Protein backbone atom coordinates (compact mmCIF):
# COMPACT_ATOMS: atom_id res chain seq x y z
CA UNK A 1 0.00 0.00 0.00
CA UNK A 2 1.29 3.43 -0.97
CA UNK A 3 0.03 6.79 0.22
CA UNK A 4 -0.85 9.28 -2.52
CA UNK A 5 -2.12 12.84 -2.54
CA UNK A 6 -4.39 13.92 -5.40
CA UNK A 7 -5.18 17.44 -6.56
CA UNK A 8 -8.70 17.82 -7.87
CA UNK A 9 -11.26 20.44 -8.81
CA UNK A 10 -15.04 20.61 -8.68
CA UNK A 11 -17.91 22.95 -9.44
CA UNK A 12 -19.62 23.82 -6.19
CA UNK A 13 -23.17 24.28 -7.46
CA UNK A 14 -23.51 20.56 -8.20
CA UNK A 15 -22.87 19.42 -4.62
CA UNK A 16 -24.27 20.00 -1.13
CA UNK A 17 -20.90 21.14 0.19
CA UNK A 18 -17.69 19.18 0.61
CA UNK A 19 -17.85 17.32 3.91
CA UNK A 20 -19.27 13.80 4.11
CA UNK A 21 -22.78 13.74 5.54
CA UNK A 22 -23.42 17.34 4.48
CA UNK A 23 -26.60 16.57 2.56
CA UNK A 24 -27.08 13.64 0.22
CA UNK A 25 -24.63 14.69 -2.48
CA UNK A 26 -21.45 16.12 -0.98
CA UNK A 27 -18.12 16.10 -2.82
CA UNK A 28 -16.59 13.73 -0.27
CA UNK A 29 -19.57 11.33 -0.34
CA UNK A 30 -19.52 11.27 -4.13
CA UNK A 31 -15.82 10.38 -4.31
CA UNK A 32 -15.96 7.73 -1.56
CA UNK A 33 -19.13 6.09 -2.92
CA UNK A 34 -17.68 5.95 -6.43
CA UNK A 35 -14.45 4.37 -5.19
CA UNK A 36 -16.31 1.81 -3.07
CA UNK A 37 -18.64 0.86 -5.92
CA UNK A 38 -15.56 0.08 -8.00
CA UNK A 39 -13.77 -1.99 -5.37
CA UNK A 40 -11.66 0.84 -3.92
CA UNK A 41 -12.81 0.58 -0.30
CA UNK A 42 -10.60 3.35 1.04
CA UNK A 43 -11.05 6.25 3.40
CA UNK A 44 -9.83 9.61 2.17
CA UNK A 45 -8.41 12.61 3.99
CA UNK A 46 -9.08 16.07 2.56
CA UNK A 47 -7.20 19.35 2.84
CA UNK A 48 -10.12 21.80 2.68
CA UNK A 49 -13.81 21.41 3.47
CA UNK A 50 -15.37 24.03 1.29
CA UNK A 51 -18.92 25.27 1.86
CA UNK A 52 -21.83 24.71 -0.48
CA UNK A 53 -21.51 26.62 -3.78
CA UNK A 54 -17.76 27.14 -3.29
CA UNK A 55 -15.75 25.68 -6.19
CA UNK A 56 -12.18 24.42 -6.29
CA UNK A 57 -9.52 24.25 -8.93
CA UNK A 58 -7.03 22.38 -6.71
CA UNK A 59 -8.25 20.89 -3.46
CA UNK A 60 -6.29 17.87 -2.17
CA UNK A 61 -7.26 14.46 -0.84
CA UNK A 62 -5.03 11.54 0.13
CA UNK A 63 -5.52 7.79 0.39
CA UNK A 64 -3.50 4.59 0.76
CA UNK A 65 -3.90 2.17 -2.12
CA UNK A 66 -2.28 -0.77 -3.84
CA UNK A 67 -3.57 0.51 -7.18
CA UNK A 68 -1.75 2.97 -9.38
CA UNK A 69 -2.58 6.66 -8.90
CA UNK A 70 -3.44 6.85 -12.60
CA UNK A 71 -6.10 4.17 -12.04
CA UNK A 72 -7.63 6.08 -9.13
CA UNK A 73 -7.65 9.35 -11.07
CA UNK A 74 -9.03 7.68 -14.19
CA UNK A 75 -11.87 6.10 -12.25
CA UNK A 76 -12.98 9.39 -10.72
CA UNK A 77 -12.62 11.32 -13.97
CA UNK A 78 -14.59 8.78 -15.99
CA UNK A 79 -17.44 8.19 -13.55
CA UNK A 80 -18.09 11.48 -11.77
CA UNK A 81 -19.34 14.60 -13.50
CA UNK A 82 -18.11 18.00 -12.29
CA UNK A 83 -15.12 16.56 -10.39
CA UNK A 84 -11.71 16.42 -12.05
CA UNK A 85 -8.50 14.85 -10.67
CA UNK A 86 -5.58 16.44 -12.49
CA UNK A 87 -2.39 15.56 -10.58
CA UNK A 88 -0.95 13.36 -7.85
CA UNK A 89 2.13 12.81 -5.67
CA UNK A 90 3.48 9.95 -3.59
CA UNK A 91 3.58 11.13 0.02
CA UNK A 92 4.84 9.79 3.38
CA UNK A 93 2.64 7.45 5.41
CA UNK A 94 2.02 10.16 8.02
CA UNK A 95 1.02 12.78 5.43
CA UNK A 96 -2.00 14.84 6.42
CA UNK A 97 -3.33 17.03 3.58
CA UNK A 98 -4.60 19.60 6.07
CA UNK A 99 -1.01 20.32 7.16
CA UNK A 100 -0.11 22.37 4.11
CA UNK A 101 2.39 25.19 3.68
CA UNK A 102 -0.44 27.48 2.58
CA UNK A 103 -3.76 27.58 0.73
CA UNK A 104 -4.77 30.20 -1.83
CA UNK A 105 -8.36 31.28 -2.47
CA UNK A 106 -9.67 33.73 -5.04
CA UNK A 107 -12.86 35.74 -4.68
CA UNK A 108 -14.13 37.06 -8.02
CA UNK A 109 -15.81 40.46 -8.22
CA UNK A 110 -18.00 41.29 -11.20
CA UNK A 111 -18.55 45.01 -10.81
CA UNK A 112 -17.39 47.42 -13.49
CA UNK A 113 -17.43 50.38 -11.08
CA UNK A 114 -14.54 48.98 -9.01
CA UNK A 115 -10.79 48.78 -9.43
CA UNK A 116 -7.92 47.40 -7.39
CA UNK A 117 -6.90 50.84 -6.14
CA UNK A 118 -10.21 51.30 -4.30
CA UNK A 119 -10.20 47.74 -2.99
CA UNK A 120 -6.60 47.81 -1.78
CA UNK A 121 -7.32 50.58 0.75
CA UNK A 122 -8.38 48.07 3.41
CA UNK A 123 -7.29 44.79 1.86
CA UNK A 124 -3.67 44.98 2.97
CA UNK A 125 -4.69 45.47 6.61
CA UNK A 126 -5.59 41.79 6.84
CA UNK A 127 -2.01 40.70 6.14
CA UNK A 128 -0.14 39.43 9.19
CA UNK A 129 -1.17 37.67 12.39
CA UNK A 130 -4.50 38.82 13.84
CA UNK A 131 -7.40 37.61 15.93
CA UNK A 132 -10.12 37.07 13.33
CA UNK A 133 -12.98 36.38 15.75
CA UNK A 134 -14.85 39.31 14.19
CA UNK A 135 -14.78 37.63 10.79
CA UNK A 136 -15.98 34.11 11.62
CA UNK A 137 -19.12 32.45 12.85
CA UNK A 138 -19.41 31.73 16.57
CA UNK A 139 -16.73 29.19 17.36
CA UNK A 140 -14.79 28.21 20.47
CA UNK A 141 -11.59 27.44 18.56
CA UNK A 142 -8.53 29.65 18.44
CA UNK A 143 -9.38 32.49 16.05
CA UNK A 144 -5.82 33.76 15.55
CA UNK A 145 -4.60 33.25 11.99
CA UNK A 146 -1.73 34.54 9.84
CA UNK A 147 -2.54 35.88 6.37
CA UNK A 148 0.57 35.88 4.17
CA UNK A 149 -1.08 37.45 1.13
CA UNK A 150 -4.16 39.59 0.56
CA UNK A 151 -4.13 41.29 -2.82
CA UNK A 152 -6.32 42.47 -5.67
CA UNK A 153 -5.60 41.46 -9.26
CA UNK A 154 -7.10 42.29 -12.63
CA UNK A 155 -7.22 39.45 -15.14
CA UNK A 156 -8.32 41.00 -18.44
CA UNK A 157 -10.99 43.07 -16.74
CA UNK A 158 -12.04 40.40 -14.25
CA UNK A 159 -11.18 41.48 -10.70
CA UNK A 160 -10.44 39.03 -7.94
CA UNK A 161 -9.19 39.23 -4.38
CA UNK A 162 -6.54 36.64 -3.54
CA UNK A 163 -5.91 35.37 0.00
CA UNK A 164 -3.20 32.96 1.15
CA UNK A 165 -2.70 31.41 4.59
CA UNK A 166 -1.87 28.08 6.15
CA UNK A 167 -5.46 27.79 7.32
CA UNK A 168 -8.67 29.79 7.36
CA UNK A 169 -11.65 29.79 9.69
CA UNK A 170 -15.25 29.07 8.70
CA UNK A 171 -16.57 31.92 6.52
CA UNK A 172 -13.46 33.99 7.25
CA UNK A 173 -12.68 34.90 3.64
CA UNK A 174 -16.27 35.68 2.68
CA UNK A 175 -16.73 37.88 5.76
CA UNK A 176 -13.49 39.76 5.05
CA UNK A 177 -14.64 40.30 1.46
CA UNK A 178 -17.97 41.67 2.71
CA UNK A 179 -16.09 44.12 4.93
CA UNK A 180 -13.90 45.24 2.02
CA UNK A 181 -16.87 45.74 -0.31
CA UNK A 182 -18.81 47.62 2.38
CA UNK A 183 -15.91 50.05 2.94
CA UNK A 184 -14.76 50.85 -0.59
CA UNK A 185 -12.74 54.04 -0.67
CA UNK A 186 -13.00 54.50 3.10
CA UNK A 187 -9.92 53.62 5.14
CA UNK A 188 -11.13 51.60 8.12
CA UNK A 189 -9.38 49.46 10.71
CA UNK A 190 -10.97 46.00 10.41
CA UNK A 191 -9.82 45.07 13.92
CA UNK A 192 -11.00 48.21 15.73
CA UNK A 193 -13.75 46.21 17.44
CA UNK A 194 -14.40 42.57 18.32
CA UNK A 195 -18.08 42.80 17.38
CA UNK A 196 -18.86 40.14 14.80
CA UNK A 197 -19.21 41.54 11.29
CA UNK A 198 -22.85 41.04 10.25
CA UNK A 199 -22.50 40.28 6.55
CA UNK A 200 -20.99 37.40 4.55
CA UNK A 201 -20.24 37.66 0.82
CA UNK A 202 -21.80 35.20 -1.62
CA UNK A 203 -20.25 31.72 -1.77
CA UNK A 204 -20.63 31.39 -5.55
CA UNK A 205 -17.74 33.79 -6.22
CA UNK A 206 -15.21 31.94 -4.07
CA UNK A 207 -12.72 29.54 -5.64
CA UNK A 208 -10.11 27.41 -3.87
CA UNK A 209 -7.26 28.08 -6.27
CA UNK A 210 -4.44 25.86 -5.00
CA UNK A 211 -2.81 24.21 -1.99
CA UNK A 212 0.96 24.12 -1.56
CA UNK A 213 3.26 21.72 0.31
CA UNK A 214 7.00 22.12 0.83
CA UNK A 215 8.99 19.25 -0.62
CA UNK A 216 6.09 17.60 -2.48
CA UNK A 217 6.02 17.67 -6.27
CA UNK A 218 2.77 16.79 -8.01
CA UNK A 219 2.68 15.08 -11.40
CA UNK A 220 0.03 15.62 -14.04
CA UNK A 221 -2.28 12.69 -14.70
CA UNK A 222 -1.03 11.16 -17.95
CA UNK A 223 -4.21 9.67 -19.34
CA UNK A 224 -6.04 12.97 -19.54
CA UNK A 225 -5.30 15.41 -22.38
CA UNK A 226 -3.42 18.46 -21.15
CA UNK A 227 -6.08 20.73 -22.58
CA UNK A 228 -8.69 19.31 -20.16
CA UNK A 229 -7.44 21.35 -17.23
CA UNK A 230 -7.82 24.53 -19.25
CA UNK A 231 -11.30 23.47 -20.33
CA UNK A 232 -12.22 22.68 -16.74
CA UNK A 233 -10.82 25.98 -15.48
CA UNK A 234 -12.87 27.79 -18.09
CA UNK A 235 -16.00 25.90 -17.06
CA UNK A 236 -15.54 27.05 -13.45
CA UNK A 237 -15.08 30.62 -14.59
CA UNK A 238 -18.17 30.39 -16.79
CA UNK A 239 -20.07 29.05 -13.80
CA UNK A 240 -18.95 31.99 -11.65
CA UNK A 241 -19.94 34.45 -14.37
CA UNK A 242 -23.33 32.81 -14.90
CA UNK A 243 -24.12 32.71 -11.18
CA UNK A 244 -23.32 36.40 -10.81
CA UNK A 245 -25.40 37.40 -13.84
CA UNK A 246 -28.40 35.46 -12.51
CA UNK A 247 -27.97 37.08 -9.10
CA UNK A 248 -27.67 40.55 -10.63
CA UNK A 249 -30.90 40.18 -12.60
CA UNK A 250 -32.81 38.51 -9.79
CA UNK A 251 -33.00 35.07 -11.38
CA UNK A 252 -31.17 33.35 -8.52
Swiss-Prot record:
UniProt entry keywords in alphabetical sequence: Isomerase, tRNA processing
Name of the protein in question: tRNA pseudouridine synthase A
UniProt cross-references to InterPro entries, sorted A to Z: PsdUridine_synth_cat_dom_sf, PsdUridine_synth_TruA, PsdUridine_synth_TruA_a/b_dom, PsdUridine_synth_TruA_C, TruA/RsuA/RluB/E/F_N
Function: Formation of pseudouridine at positions 38, 39 and 40 in the anticodon stem and loop of transfer RNAs.
Active site: 51 (nucleophile)
Keyword Translocase set for record: no
Family statement: Belongs to the tRNA pseudouridine synthase TruA family.
Gene: truA
Example GO biological process: tRNA pseudouridine synthesis
Keyword Isomerase: yes
Organism whose genome encodes this protein: Thermoplasma acidophilum (strain ATCC 25905 / DSM 1728 / JCM 9062 / NBRC 15155 / AMRC-C165)
Catalytic class of the enzyme: isomerase
Annotated residues for binding of substrate: 105
GO molecular function, one term: tRNA pseudouridine(38-40) synthase activity
Catalyzed reactions per annotation: uridine(38/39/40) in tRNA = pseudouridine(38/39/40) in tRNA
CDD domains per UniProt: PseudoU_synth_TruA_like
Domain of life per record: Archaea
EC number: 5.4.99.12
Record HAMAP family: TruA
Gene3D superfamilies linked to this entry: Pseudouridine synthase I, catalytic domain, C-terminal subdomain (3.30.70.660), Pseudouridine synthase I, catalytic domain, N-terminal subdomain (3.30.70.580)
Matching Pfam families: PseudoU_synth_1
Amino acid sequence: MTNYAFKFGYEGSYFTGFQRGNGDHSVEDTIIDTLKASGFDYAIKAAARTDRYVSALSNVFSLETGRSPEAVAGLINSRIDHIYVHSYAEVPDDFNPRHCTFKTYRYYILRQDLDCISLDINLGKFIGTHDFRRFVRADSRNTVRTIINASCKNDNGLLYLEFSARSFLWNQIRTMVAFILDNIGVETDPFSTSERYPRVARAQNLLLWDIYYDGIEFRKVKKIPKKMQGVYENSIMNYILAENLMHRFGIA
